[in-house]
Amino acid sequence: NALETLWSPVLNQINVLKGLFPGKPVYLTGHSKGGPMATIFAARMHFTPAVTTEPEAVYTFASPHPGDKDFVDNFPLANIPVIRYENRLDIVPLVPPTEAAITLAGNKPVIGKLFKIAEGWNYASLGERRYIDKQHQVIYNKPELTPKEFRKLAWTVIAGPCGLRKVAMAHMYTCGNGYMLGTCPSGVCP
């Protein structure tokens, strides 16, 4: 269990940093698989009485859905805001698919069968969505993908190597790619 493996070392490091920087807030972040880990970690911190530090917020980048509707409904959003960044060509934030995505894609040739497998999983998005558009601008509280946007993304994925390369570049967090272009336009990159 990844959370169990990380629990003690991360809490220990948080405590060390809190000792070095008293009064400073704690933020949890994660990219890709690290997004749900940060989110689940924050929930566990909140619901563990022995843990006296609560994150100020969770920021995720390219995060898959962290849990099902029950997890989302019971997450302490009032205490720990979750801000999730999603890049327009990144498919990772769409998995596991939500019920809306399954309904949207379930009757489509090729991908429909794949989506039907996930029926009943009941995964859901969590937190405030910040969408990075084609011009690398961050759009706040953009609704989930429309059917037209979903079709366009699906065609990009199945277009072959060029489309897959675009999708892979959109998922990256390195300088000059995907998430860095939208979240850090003035640059920390050389």
Feature map (PLM): residue ranges:
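Gly/Ala-rich beta-loop-alpha elbow adjacent to hydrolase catalytic centers
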Residues: 30-34, 38
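Serine hydrolase/lipase
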Residues: 2-29, 43-190
